[in-house]
């Protein structure tokens, strides 16, 4: 495999010295880019785009051609695992993801298979290998998965939800059924992420988009517990270097200490957590990724630069910061504003890394 020309992102995740703060954006390959829309039109629909290694590679590379980003992230979807378990993923226009066969009872959970990632999810591994070849060592490639709790929200609700009543009913009325589901999902995620690492992912991230809807007790029992199991099961060395693991719970600000104790290398922060406070609490254990409100990108470039400057100053001197948004970039952000953001991070961060 190619020697990395820019390993700033991997170094920052391990709290090693860098010349400037690395930056990438969640959903950096996406609908705010006209070239993405054009490629998706060629594919026909979202899952066809994910399942075609060449097209998935193309959309992964598109933001890197526009912006000096410090990492590429695999173009895929968190719902590939439940789809491979046989739930029948499809996308309703304007409605988001849906499942033809959602989980309704214990029998549904018991019959769920644990997918073989090179078989049922081989298209993801093909995309990873294709992207690594295309990157040719320019920047690292991030692999990812949804967390068991977040995957379960879609599998039990049958799609997106605001109140999660079906899943919370299962959690409170049939906790053992939910634990069985989460355990199967954790085993599936371990196999899936390890296959991504073997295929060439140089860092992995676990997205716990919906962990923040839980009480503290329930978060520990039904979400963090299973992410901890995954971290324990991951390959942590490959191609002669460490493979860093980042956990991201949206709304996870109250639980950073417990998240840092899982053995992960970094925590993603949403914009509701103060990064200075987060660094005081866990900065001696993990790196921090984040955490600009994605809506700042609607503002003029001068305002974007001001926000970047504020967050850099809030984190302060030294290592262990990967700049990112606090969640995915919105689809109607002007591409030039994303460019202003990336350039501002690089331009304004150098003084924070001088010895």
Swiss-Prot record:
- The highest taxon in the source lineage is Bacteria
Q: Which GO terms describe its biological process?
A: heme biosynthetic process; protoporphyrinogen IX biosynthetic process from glutamate
What's a single GO CC term here? cytosol
Q: Which pathway or pathways does this protein act in?
A: Porphyrin-containing compound metabolism; protoporphyrin-IX biosynthesis; coproporphyrinogen-III from 5-aminolevulinate: step 4/4
Which Gene3D superfamilies does this one have?
3.20.20.210
For this protein, the record's CDD domains field holds: URO-D
Enzyme class of the recorded protein, top EC level: lyase
Q: Name the major location.
A: cytoplasm
Task: Indicate where this protein resides in the cell.
Answer: Cytoplasm
Is Cytoplasm found in the keyword set?
A: yes
EC numbers listed for it are: 4.1.1.37
Query: Which residues are substrate-binding?
Result: 27-31, 46, 77, 154, 209, 327
Q: Where is this site: Transition state stabilizer?
A: 77
Q: Does the keyword Cytoplasm apply?
A: yes
GO MF terms, alphabetically ordered: uroporphyrinogen decarboxylase activity
The family assignment reads:
Belongs to the uroporphyrinogen decarboxylase family.
* Annotated PANTHER family: METHYLTETRAHYDROFOLATE:HOMOCYSTEINE METHYLTRANSFERASE RELATED, UROPORPHYRINOGEN DECARBOXYLASE
Summarizing the function annotation, the protein's role is: Catalyzes the decarboxylation of four acetate groups of uroporphyrinogen-III to yield coproporphyrinogen-III.
List the protein's name.
Uroporphyrinogen decarboxylase
What organism is the protein native to?
A: Yersinia pestis
Q: Organism classification, top ranks?
A: Bacteria, Pseudomonadati, Pseudomonadota, Gammaproteobacteria, Enterobacterales
